[in-house]
Amino acid sequence: MTATDRTPPPLKWLCLGNRDANDGFELFAHGIYARNGALVGSKLSLRERRQRVDLSAFLSGAPPLLAEAAVKHLLARLLCVHRHNTDLELLGKNFIPLHASSLGNAGVCERILASARQLQQHQVELCLLLAIDEQEPASAEYLTSLARLRDSGVRIALHPQRIDTDARQCFAEVDAGLCDYLGLDARLLAPGPLTRNLRQRKSIEYLNRLLVAQDIQMLCLNVDNEELHQQANALPFAFRHGRHYSEPFQAWPFSSPAC
């Protein structure tokens, strides 16, 4: 498969904001588990039927204006699930992947806030899984957006793309009391040079000591095989996610236009 096969042409995304949020999309959930194996939540993704595109990566890396359209569609799907399945507990906590920079778009924040209020009527917990890969310190505007979201009942999971640098970017959010979870990708635990592994282990253990005092729990993402499971199990992760534990499932077929 070529890069072109994986990445849709930019023009295709321009129609997202104008399309009916109930047309042609499927919502998938991928389980998040506690150390004892209990299902506690789901990482959500949205797939477009006609283009056969998984929007989860798009949500994490899109420019803010396009991210707003993707958020609109995913939240519309999620609301539809809970309107028609009032006893649905399988999704648990709903983790939505989004790039932290997208919170600079007022439309994204307003869409999330409005949806959070609606989901709370169904006793549904919404959590943003915010990808962080910037070197600049967190801006006052960004922290203000986080505060608004948390005050409205939205949980925040920070997802730094590296341990040695980006994890430090989380400290402003942590110090301000604006973080509920810290997510790290299992690829950071992959075997490598001993010095690197020791440095990463010490970084993770240090982060855990820093976070546990503030009741912030750690989540290991994309644990896709037994080796990564063993690595994650040896470290203080409260929750794990990945194909080692389960495959993504379609939350609702959405074959009916009733939503």
Swiss-Prot record:
It holds the Pfam family EAL. GO terms for cellular component: plasma membrane. SUPFAM superfamilies: EAL domain-like (SSF141868). Keywords: Activator, Cell inner membrane, Cell membrane, Membrane, Transcription, Transcription regulation. InterPro entries: EAL_dom, EAL_sf. It is a peripheral membrane protein. It is found in: Cell inner membrane. Its main location: membrane. One of its GO terms (biological process) is positive regulation of DNA-templated transcription. Positive regulation of toxA gene transcription. This is Exotoxin A regulatory protein. It comes from Pseudomonas aeruginosa (strain ATCC 15692 / DSM 22644 / CIP 104116 / JCM 14847 / LMG 12228 / 1C / PRS 101 / PAO1). The lineage of its organism: Bacteria, Pseudomonadati, Pseudomonadota, Gammaproteobacteria, Pseudomonadales.
